[in-house]
Amino acid sequence: MSGLGLQGVTVETVLQNPSLQAGSTLHGEISFKGGSSDKEINGLYLQLVTMAEVESGDHEFNQPLVLQEWLVNSRFLLPAHQAHSFPFSIQLPFETPITEVACRRNGARVWIQTHMDVDWGLDATDRDYLKVLPTPAMQMFLQAMQRCGFVLSTVDVEKGQLTARNFRSTIGCYQELEFVSSH
């Protein structure tokens, strides 16, 4: 389209604290600029996304899974070539998968997807990866497993829900930590 002299809307998100723990508040700013013509924007969204392993019959595959979505701004008119920005603060769910752990194979990825829904135009998107650190309780668990003679081998995220006596997961996935004996 830009070859025809039509420039689309652009969006860029800058995260102030991309390294954080689950349950913490993420701060940032979304900057965007209008294209070659005025555009009606249906909404500006932030999505917390992970790559989840999905089991289907005898097969497994990975697919992006939206864990939570926040509406930053609803319908508005974006004039041609005008630049705007919105600061934001969002709290990550306490069940957000951790990504920063020492292991042999870490398949956990978490990112913020910015999505601008452009009416009658190409939607503008941006992806920014997060470093989700273990909480103090998770750190204590990982250290206890190590003291018991186990090494964290594999970390991944699986689509599904966990249910226990007084708990039910809420984000549509769970994190799997696989340990092996260090002996």
Residue ranges and their predicted role:
Residues 1-183:
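C-terminal beta-sandwich interaction modules and adjacent acidic
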